Amino acid sequence: MADLRKHKIGWIGTGRMGFSMAARLLKKGAQVAVYNRTRAKAEPLAPLGAQLADSPAALADRDIVFTMVAGSGDLLEVVSGPKGLLSRAGRAPKILIDCSTISQEASAEARGAAAAAGCAMLAAPVSGNAKVVKAGRLSLVVSGSKDAYDEALPWLESLGEGVSYVGEGELSRIVKICHNVFLGVVTQSLAEITVLAEKAGVPRHAFLDFINKSVMGSTFSRYKTPAFVNLDFAPTFTPVLLRKDLDLGLAAARKHEVPMPLTAAVRELVQALIGNGYVDTDFAALLALEAKAARLELKPENVAVGDGLYT
């Protein structure tokens, strides 16, 4: 087992995902100092052993620094802004690892700034949410310097159960964008067929039980079953964030001349979801929008169903 105390770790961004990932590193024994724009969101990590930093720049002396922020502008601010990680001449971590879902262009800009400061950068976006992190089921896709990847691998592996290296540069960014496009399209499709089955008389829990046991069942369909059955839309990933990722996918499609009509349609449905007030809920609320369009009144079924994360 690798010694996770070999390098000092910095962590920038303790939202839902960043908090859970930093907490996992701490529980695995890593030495972690954390920064978050809203300090109160980072403070609960202190009892786990985290040091609290007052700015990203204060983490420049760490060996490896992870970032997990909401978007492209946020990453560039915490990396290259006035108090950014690389704002002090001659001070930079050895490796910067960004786990956010951002554009390839912003990632390349951050990578260039890191290289100018003598810092290697890995793009390492993730598949999962805070609950998945807690269950140890997070997956990461990584691109960048192979040497930096090999050095950082013990810390990457400690975050979850799967790490995939796909090559140099920003290749992992397009992989993650495609992943989240798939997430949106699959969720909309699952919402449509669930509403169809229920309106025809099949209880949601019975329909999804069959789907999950069939060849079409998946980790994801099982994970979203409790939300669909009992209408618990507590946010794991919001419609606003999904809209951002669908926009990234459509921008990449235009760049590479790839038609994506399903993605374009789902993007507008997510926009409608937001317009109907589903802003701080889970994106599984696409089910509610579909039911409304079908004039189906949804009610919680109050059936105990598993999410497949724990066996």
Predicted regions and their residues:
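NAD(P)+-binding Rossmann beta1-loop-alpha1 motif at the extreme N-terminus of oxidoreductases
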Residues: 1-60, 64-67, 94, 298
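Hydrophobic beta-strand scaffold residues
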Residues: 32, 52, 121-122, 163, ...
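Helical "substrate-binding/catalytic lid" subdomain
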Residues: 151, 171-294
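Rossmann-fold NAD(P) dinucleotide-binding segment
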Residues: 56-119
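Hydrophobic residues within alpha-helices
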Residues: 21-22, 41, 110, 155, ...
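Rossmann-fold dinucleotide-binding core
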Residues: 101-181
